[in-house]
Amino acid sequence: MLERTLRVLEYNKVKEQLLEHTASSLGRDKVKNLVPSTDFEEIVELQETTDEAAKVIRLKGHVPLGGISDIRANIKRAKIGSMLSPHELIEIASTMYGSRQMKRFIDDMIDNGVELPILETHVAQIVSLYDLEKKITNCIGDGGEVVDSASDKLRGIRNQIRTAESRIREKLENMTRSSNAQKMLSDAIVTIRNERYVIPVKQEYRGVYGGIVHDQSASGQTLFIEPQVIVELNNALQEARVKEKQEVERILMMLTEEVAVEADIVLSNVEVVANLDFIFAKALYAKRIKATKPIVNNERYMDLKQARHPLIDPEIIVPNNIMLGKDFTTIVITGPNTGGKTVTLKTVGICVLMAQSGLHIPVMDESEICVFKNIFADIGDEQSIEQNLSTFSSHMVNIVDILEKADFESLVLFDELGAGTDPQEGAALAISILDEVCNRGARVVATTHYPELKAYGYNREQVINASVEFDVNTLSPTYKLLIGVPGRSNAFEISKRLGLSDRVIDRARNHISTDTNKIENMIAKLEESQKNAERERKEAEEHRKQSEKLHRELQRQIIEFNDERDEKLLKAQKEGEEKVEAAKQEAEGIIQELRQLRKAQLINVKDHELIEAKSRLEGAAPELVKKQKVNVKNTAPKQQLRSGDEVKVLTFGQKGQLLEKVSDTEWSVQIGILKMKVKESNMEYINTPKQTEKKAVASVKGRDYHVSLELDLRGERYEDAMMRVEKYLDDAQLASYPRVSIIHGKGTGALRQGVQDYLKKHRGVKTYRYGDMGEGGLGVTVVELK
């Protein structure tokens, strides 16, 4: 990409704004080195990466990139054996922490179901060095000092230092508080000179304290003396400080060596977080300028919807729709110089540069942009004083360079093509230059104020005229781009509004040819038609938005109604269940008491009578409870859905008809007068197949004992066997068994006959039969219960 193109399209100003959103010097370096890519696959991935970061910003509002520094120089010093300072080690630990936090932040979002495949790949490269990070922070405090707990030896040395300092101060303070101190000392203080404790003694009393003179005042009247009584203590203190320094250096060197061991991993982590800082800076910048991800195509056309220039306040700029490459390959914007044509030109250029840099662009959703190998721009007045070139010559030098390099993979932007020379010759050159570039297959946007180029757009198939709308009432451009309408000067209308007499204006009109007047009138009518069409489009758009709003409101009300209904039904169901459960518990208690009384032969109540009473109680359960049970039982497996099937939309509780499948997981469903997209997970096929009968479970609900699926009577006396059969059938029916087996053996047949005679009379028995070959044959009776 030509440096001149980046400069005239103000690409570096965009980078300056992007820099404001980086969190570290690492990210800032990435921004400074940013240039547009020309590789299609790379650009698509860059856009997807920025979009993932933008998703994170939308969901979380921030990213934990604090504490990250450019520690690469520190790591290199550690690798060559130089001892790192406490501050440098703290920077390394802080960056390790920041890397670890960033990895955890993204991983947590992914664990919560947020899809971030590209960012996941980035953070997967971060290797946690938690042990080394903690070792550094345990040895070095926030202020950059090596703490006492860094080693037992250091703690002991510092205790010695504190003890020595305390003893020295105590002795010196006793001296300063003595009765003679006021006379012999300049001030009753203890101070330090040359790292040794001293007191300020008047010159004439220097011999009183003995010791060593370390300094004197500017006047020479005061000497800073280390009294003889503390010389040995000061010597001991200095020795301890030397030991302290040696131990601190040993600890720092130990930490440096451990950093050197992990140097490659640390540098790799730094590169990852540098990229993450850069990626999230792009996402934050997109949020700032209200930008979106464009669709990147490789088919050499662009469709920018409501495009804005990123460096102009979005509150004041007028967005424009700009299409290029499908129906036409060249746009020629004509009209007066004050109409904002250059802004439109720069908007196209900067949007392409941003998109190819992986930046989102200030356009509406669904905008498309293509990849250009080269972008050429001849914009602005760049006269070269050194080369003694005029405006025209300066432009022509640039145009010659463009014509040498432009091809079918190029975007060419011309501002005021052919300006700066004789209008007739300039217009002719402009037409010839445009023909040359268009014939090479390049995509071109050109601005001009030459009226001759208005006809150019009508004489070439791949060229279309455009203009920037001008409001003659306010005498100012609206900056609205009108595709298909050539510009006009509006000189007569402006002059009239400014007070020029009609006589002068009419005379001026007579100097213009009839054909020119016709063309101007035709353009005026085209502008009016364009305005009317745009107004009608806006009205239709407003009606559409209102319809969508009403549709959303109706959906919301339906959902609220269904939620409220379901809430009330659930509440009623719960209350009913609680009442029925209470009654069941009470009935269970009564049945147990009656059985106890029967065992004690105080009353005569049959178990099947108790069963019937319990069945009547269960029959009193609310319909809602039964319905809920049925729904749970009849949950059908997922059906193969087809267009025309009737389904139930679970969110609304409404029936609907499938129209068409719009994606892998969504269908278009007609629900009454509404048509909406519904996920398969939110619908239920109405014609659910019948469920196979559930197998009985071998436990009695609400009881504290187990009931077997078979009763073995072999070896029992007849009377005892009959009592067991009666009890067993009652328990099996309470357990809701559909079928049981009674083993009586073949023997003489008396027990078998007695069992079957009893079964004939029992009201809970539906049918009975001998067992099949695999069930025990004549030695077993299989009983079907009601």
From Swiss-Prot:
Keyword Transmembrane helix on entry: no
Pfam families attached to this UniProt entry: MSSS, MutS_V, Smr
UniProt-annotated stretches for the region Disordered: 529-549
Residues that, per the record, bind ATP: 335-342
Family (UniProt): Belongs to the DNA mismatch repair MutS family. MutS2 subfamily.
Subunit structure: Homodimer. Binds to stalled ribosomes, contacting rRNA.
Protein name: Endonuclease MutS2
Natural source organism: Bacillus mycoides (strain KBAB4)
